[in-house]
Amino acid sequence: MDNLDSAQTVPPIAMLAMLLLLLAAVVYYSLLNGVVLHYIKSYINNQGVANPEEVTEGVRNDFWKLTGTSLAIGILTAAGTMLCVIPGIYVGVVLSTIYAVVVFERKEVIDAIKHCFTLIKNEWWMTFATLIVIFILYYFIIMIVQIPQYIYFFIKGFSMMQIISTDPAALFDWGYILLTSIALIFQYLLHTIVVLCVAFIYFHLHEKKYFTGTMEEIDSIGSL
């Protein structure tokens, strides 16, 4: 009974570490979406030339709003998933464009959530299918990048089997740490492409709903 109680007790330092990791992830994804989307916004507003100062100012002004957006996505998606997996998936797809709504339409978090449901109406399945393709490609590329890490892991494991049997930590040397770090950095950078793809999903949905001509404007800038 004592062993069970001790296993279920999480040390305070571990809880603090998990909380800090969660906050770091929220800040990271908020800043990533903010930088990429404000870059696109500046690119469109300045006819194909992004202004770094404009991007920095936009991210600074929207930081707390974007952070609140990240928290709202996490809470609503988690709540939907706990009720049943399908509601979680549905809400996740609906809110996939919320960062773009916050940045491009200057809406507050609550208004942005409402607008996402309006924006995706009658387009949920198409958006879902597009996101599936994007994330399949994303994870496929990540797997390719991680191949050197796995090869190194298995070669070292077989060549140092006797040493590792007495000291498992010997498997995780500087070579493994370096390859893992490179793969993680590439993974974070690659997520930029996911943000870009979701931004174009937003423009497509907005164009179909309101006929604003934004997609034609972007195409015309790209052809200059």
Q: What feature does the model see in each segment?
A:
Residues M1-D2, L31:
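Transmembrane-helix bundle segments that line or gate the permeation/cavity pathway
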Residues L4, L37-N45, V91-V109, L119, ...:
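Juxtamembrane transition segments at transmembrane-helix termini in multipass membrane proteins
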Residues L4-Y28, G175-L178:
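Membrane-embedded or membrane-proximal helical elements that form or frame transporter/channel pores
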Residues P12-L16, P52, T56, R60, ...:
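Alpha-helical membrane-protein architecture signal
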Residues L20-Y28, C84, I182-L190:
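Alpha-helical transmembrane segments of integral membrane proteins
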Residues L23, V27, F63-A79, F128-F140, ...:
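Hydrophobic, lipid-facing residues on alpha-helical transmembrane segments of integral membrane proteins
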Residues V26, S30, I75-T97:
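Hydrophobic, aromatic-rich membrane-embedded alpha-helical segments
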Residues N33-V59:
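Hydrophobic transmembrane alpha-helix segments characteristic of membrane transport
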